[in-house]
Amino acid sequence: MSSTKWTDEQRQAVFTKNCNLLVAAGAGAGKTAVLVQRIIEKILDKEEPIDIDKLLVVTFTNAAAAEMRERIGDAISKGLDENPESKALRKQLTLLNKSNIMTIHSFCLQIIKNNFHTIEIDPNFRICDETEGILMKQEAMDELFDELYEIENKDFINLVESYASRKDTRLQEVVLELHRFAKSAPFPYDWLLNMAEEFNVGEEFNFEETLWADMIMEDMKVLLHGFKNMLQQSIDVILNSEGIDYYYEPFKMDLNFINSLLEKSSFKEFRGEIIAYDFPKLPLKRNKDADKEAKERVKKLRDRVKKKILEIKNILNSYENEFIKKEFIFLYPSMKALSNLVILFDKKYEAKKRERDLIDFNDIEHLCLSILTDKDSEDHIIPSDTALDYRKKFTEVLIDEYQDSNLVQEVIMSMVSRVKGYWSFYNGQLMFNEEEINLEEPHIGLDIPNRFMVGDVKQSIYRFRQAKPEIFLDKYNEYSEEESIKNRKVKLFKNFRSREEVINGVNYLFKQIMSKTIGELDYTEEEALKVGASYGEEVKGEPIELCLMDKKYEISEEVLKEYNMDEEEALDNIQLEGRLVAKKIQKLVGNNLEGGLKVFDKKLGEYRNLQYRDIVILMRATSNWAPVFVEELAKEGIPVFADTNSGYFNTTEIKTIISLLQIIDNPLQDIPLLSVLRSPIASFTDDELIDIRMVNKNIAFYECMEIIYKLYKDEELDSYYSFYMEDEDKTNKIVKDIKEELKNKICSFIEKLNLWRKKSIHIDIDEFIWFLYVETGYYGYVGALPAGEQRQANLRILFQRAKQYEKTSYKGLFNFINFINKLKFSSGDMGSAKILGENENVVRIMSIHKSKGLEFPVVILSGTGKNFNMMDLNKNILFHRDLGYGPDYVDTERRIAYPSLVKNIIKNKIRLETLSEEMRILYVALTRAREKLIITGLINNMDKTVEDWLNLSDDKNKVPEYAVMSGKTYLDWIGPALIKHKDAVSLREELKITSGLSNIVDDKSKWKIELWNKKELLKEKVEENEVEISEKIKETLMNLGESNYKEEIYKKLSFKYKYDNASSIPTKLSVSDVKKQFILDEKENTEELFKKVELRKPMFMGEEKKISPSERGTIIHLFMQHLDLKKAENEEDIKEQINRLIEREFITYEQSKIINPYKILKFCRSELGKRMINSNNINREMPFSIEVPAVEIYRELDKDIYKDEKLIIQGIIDCYFEEEEGLVLLDYKTDYVNDIEEIKNRYEIQIKYYEEALNRITGKNVKDKYLYLFSVDNYIKID
């Protein structure tokens, strides 16, 4: 076994044989390492080695599969180093390329390609693009609806009238959603028909004996447990308070009633007892010694219970069997019609795919399933001959991320694994039956179980993709930890990622809030994470921080006046939370001198200062919040990048180009036309557009332009225009009065547009788009704007989308525009192009889903006060994979519509499942942190909210399930759990809350709870605007008449600061600014610093764009930042790395020509390059800020007056690396060199500040400083 020190549980997971093994691995437990080690041990086993191609390893992503292959390859290579003569190891290395380590979809695709003849598909099939599939679906849908309207299909018409509202699109959306949903079932047609048949009830129907009735009762029992806690709490207060003991009996009767209900197993008895119960009246006794506060408190609690029980009673009263039966009978025809409509749609869509030899992503699993399954005489689903061959082939089947499996994948894996049993339908549900099946040929080794499944159900967060965590949970509850049994489980809950402080906090929180009801698992001490990581004693861990801000914090008029703000500006909540986070980050990072957080660097094996790249801000959804946070962090000088899936189609450059394509396809579209006309592509002014529109207000804008064009060119107008012109003479006069310049502009635009329209017909769309970029100069134009690199990358993405489109079965500009429109909605927007590498020193903002599997030294979870998304519950038909359809009851004749009983049941079930998913998402978020965890959130009303939290905190061990069920935000869960923690005492004191102090939980977790208010954060916003406001006042005064006070006010506003010289000095300078200042100081003659600017046409608008020296330097620096020194042995290696940067869109092909592979290779082979390669600690592109005396930079300042003035110098160090005696500083230069001494003098001061920054930041000595000069392929040492 490897040199890694494995725990006993990990060893069991690696070595256990001859059983189905489920490994439940908590966050940070090293499950991937265990899975890889198990594979390595099997192929390197000295007694019974298994060839690696006899193992099937199913991963969740292609990246995971590649990483696994690499690790296994490294292990085999290491074995060969120790035993070079080993034929067995060489064989495994050769077989590694043929190994079956892949995603489930890759495995299914492999099966389809090897067995295409059994399912009658063309062997040259292609997987269609997602958007191409959407276009085909829309075609199929439109054709199907037209056909059904034409034959006047009665059931279809009724369905349309009931659920389509005024547009067919609403019903079409229902069909598409149900189609997607059904495809998550192994046998979609069976599922659709079975779910419709659930409404086909006979006279013998008895609702009280159905699954739905049991579900209603179980859901209500969760609430009853909450009522029981309230009543028990009240009784405790009664018994411990003065003078209210006469309340004991009625409260005890209520409690007995609740206990009786909780014991009921029959819905009929349960319903009957609730309906029959009347709450006894409370005695009307007066006792002057009675504790009035306690009396009022218990009365309020009982009133809450009574109100809720009355609501339940009213619901149950409506559950009359006959009424429910009539509802089912009425809905059956519609639901059957809906199932049939989806099946007809699927068949039409399938036909379209077959015409084009296409399959879509969903087909991959279903076609594979059809190859691997067969049916016996009893209609049981059993393995086919092909599946049996795979069972013989694979000695073991290993499944990673098992908690995210869906039912289709589970059936597929069961077919190729050596399991005894079959699948069959029971009450409409597909179930696995673990029994012996009769096969024509006995399967050798079938009695030896061979499945290895690893995952963490607490991290199952893909229910929206139809993942079914119940598959994992069923086995987790069924399998045993005992040895020598066929179905065994091993628990890996030791966390090797996080500090003890993070783990203790996570454990405390989820013990309080996660349960089988919400989370689908009881988070007990047994499930809790155990500390496995060691961070030493050098730096102590910090408590988890919870930062709360009151949304409804009242800001007085005086405060608003003081800050010169209006109320709307003052109450931008997302902005304020972003500002709060910015303050936290500034404090964490410090000023790179002291005060910042220290984090442990695994690569260095020591502590270092926190950098921006160590911080991630996690959000449930980033679309609306991330842009605001980016803006707030950027204002504070914090480098930040938001990894979002939205915003791409809303960027100016993309909207402009899409508008241009739309008018090339059809210019009679006013909105896109005006968008293009106002853009730099056409550069029309608003006044010019008004002049054009005045020609005629009743026709399209382009037609107005055509009238001007034709009249100006003396061309005859079409009769169409004459018809719309109320007064032809008046129109002629309007056109005549239009300026000559505008007429020429219109003519030029129309002629260009006509040329573009003709060209679009004859070339591919991707070529045409690039032609437009160049022809209009727009690509160059956006590159010159702020964030130009990002804008150009976005345009390149559109070009790539066009290339992708050209590979589909659709052609032409019109279809491409449809393609893009569908892409907007199907992919939920794409997010802007990614231009940052993994090592960029920026704070990252990402969704919790994207963070899964990752870890970060510091995690900030924001937006915890944001409501969960429950919008799907408002649809007129709901779908559930087990419960089927939940439609509204719609009677078009009587004009009645309301949620059906089954819809209410399904709605509640989906709500609970959604809450369970949110619970697991919260778990994923909090377990990403290695060293520091911060949670931020907004609260509606702090005092009331905290009081509500206290009312839910009587049970020290658990927040009541009914309270968790009613939660609408993460804070609704976190708050009640923390308010009873010992570290929340300060919060209670600050809010002057004295109740509930007897329920303090003395847990070992450490928390720091902070209250923020808007006033604190608003103050700084105002200071930024003060100068601007002052200038506005002065401008107003200039326009006023004479006033006694005008002169005095103006004098004060024009006040000259005593230290005016210092006030003009910036507080922050770049190192380049400092260098320029020193060069200026050293010049004896007084040159003009500011010369007259000559305006000329930008280079990018000319025929050929030349790359400037500064851009050349930027490109070289970018490449050196990303250069992998270990993979730069020859020019081909370097060219490959250049191509990788082009593929990742870091540079363009044109820019890549600047990089000379030979010169890069010369650097790598130089003595300096070799030293750098041999270093174990290389740092590149490191930003810094240091404080220096102002007089050091600005020598004209009086040293006595300005001795205490400080400046912040900022810069980015190209590279430094560590050797035994100290650090080596390296700066790349692309200047053309004539005089070495001149270069040294030019950059001496710059290197000096780099050295000082490194000394201060690292605390280490800089032993050598070098400039590497690419123009002469040599380096010089700076003394």
Curated annotation (Swiss-Prot):
ATP binds at A25, G26, A27, G28, A29, G30, K31, T32. Its EC number is 3.1.-.-, 5.6.2.4. It comes from the Bacteria. Pfam families: PDDEXK_1 (PF12705), UvrD-helicase (PF00580), UvrD_C (PF13361). Keywords: ATP-binding, DNA damage, DNA repair, DNA-binding, Exonuclease, Helicase, Hydrolase, Isomerase, Nuclease, Nucleotide-binding. The heterodimer acts as both an ATP-dependent DNA helicase and an ATP-dependent, dual-direction single-stranded exonuclease. Recognizes the chi site generating a DNA molecule suitable for the initiation of homologous recombination. The AddA nuclease domain is required for chi fragment generation; this subunit has the helicase and 3' -> 5' nuclease activities. Heterodimer of AddA and AddB/RexB. This is ATP-dependent helicase/nuclease subunit A. It comes from Clostridium botulinum (strain Loch Maree / Type A3). The gene is addA.
